[in-house]
Amino acid sequence: GFDYASDCRGTQPFMPVWQGEVIHCPQLPTTLPTLDELLGVGGLNEGNVHERLLELTVNAPPTGHIYTLHAELEGMKLLPVFEKLLTGWRAQGYTITTTRAIFASLDKAALPRCEIVRGTLPGRSGTLMLQGNPYLDRWKLAAA
């Protein structure tokens, strides 16, 4: 099996729950929008889209951010944008690392259990999987 997955959107690493069953494969969700979701929205273009992403990373969550890039965009046509992002993230104090290193640093037993749901995001065509609500939290509140 997989040690971990990074194929949904969310706010922090979590243990996914699907239809009431805990899936024992930690999820390291993408926490930031992709360039193709931002370009052309609200006046964002190749010359300024990096500024929007850097605004979103000014304050780092405790587990950091995970950014998904597309080799055919950031590695080719939008390489200058990606270089600006890397420079900006380093200036913000981030260490560029791998999802494997993030996974290795996690206390897996302490990860929140969250539902995984299908949904949509602005700028993204179709549906994708999203980190949902913490599992059973609404029942814990009702019992309190």
Where in this protein do the model-derived segments appear?
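Alpha-helical scaffold elements lining the catalytic groove of polysaccharide deacetylases
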Residues: P16-P61, P80
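Structural preference for beta-strand elements that scaffold enzyme active sites
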Residues: D3, C25-Q27, G64-T68
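C-terminal domain-boundary segment and adjacent tail
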Residues: N59-A144
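His/Asp/Glu-enriched short active-site or ligand-binding loop at hydrolase and phosphoryl-transfer sites
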Residues: G1-W18, Q27-L39, G93-L106
